[in-house]
Amino acid sequence: MADLDQQFLLSQIARRGPWNDCANLPTVVQAASEQTRIGLVLADAAFDSERNHTYIRRELGAQSVIPAKRGKKTWRIHGVRAQMRREFSRRVHRRRARIESLFSSVKRKLSARAPGRSLRAQKRQALLLGLSFNLYRLRHRCLFSRMSTGPDGF
């Protein structure tokens, strides 16, 4: 989970992939909501489930913008998912592309792999990558805020 405006990671889970992360969305969102108020959750179609929409909207009081999965024609979409399909905002969901930019930045600046031998070490290294990226962003944000373009900034 990330703050797209500040480009910070708010919460993360590390596990061996490939894995279906749909069931983990409430856990990750809950961990992030303990750090800051969550007003909007953007996710891709892999996270589309009635359970996820209901959790985000009822438990957190946030808006969820998750495109509906394309399934069999016999699937009946009802409840919050049906409402999401009717009222889906492509303009708002376009902001989700920023998370891909953030992931790319983590991989470029730090690393794309956790080379530990054991699964436990790999998980720990993956979580430390997220922490390191946040520290990197804090440092560079402070440097940019101290820079001045005015003539008296020297």
Describe every region a protein language model picked out:
Residues 1-60, 67-69, 130, 148:
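Polybasic low-complexity intrinsically disordered regions
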Residues 21, 55, 62, 79, ...:
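A generic membrane alpha-helix/interface feature
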Residues 31-32, 75, 125-126:
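Juxtamembrane/interface motifs at transmembrane-helix termini
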Residues 45-115:
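Helix-centered, glycine/charged polyanion-binding patches within enzymatic domains
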Residues 85-154:
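Basic, amphipathic alpha-helical segments enriched in Lys/Arg and hydrophobic/aromatic residues
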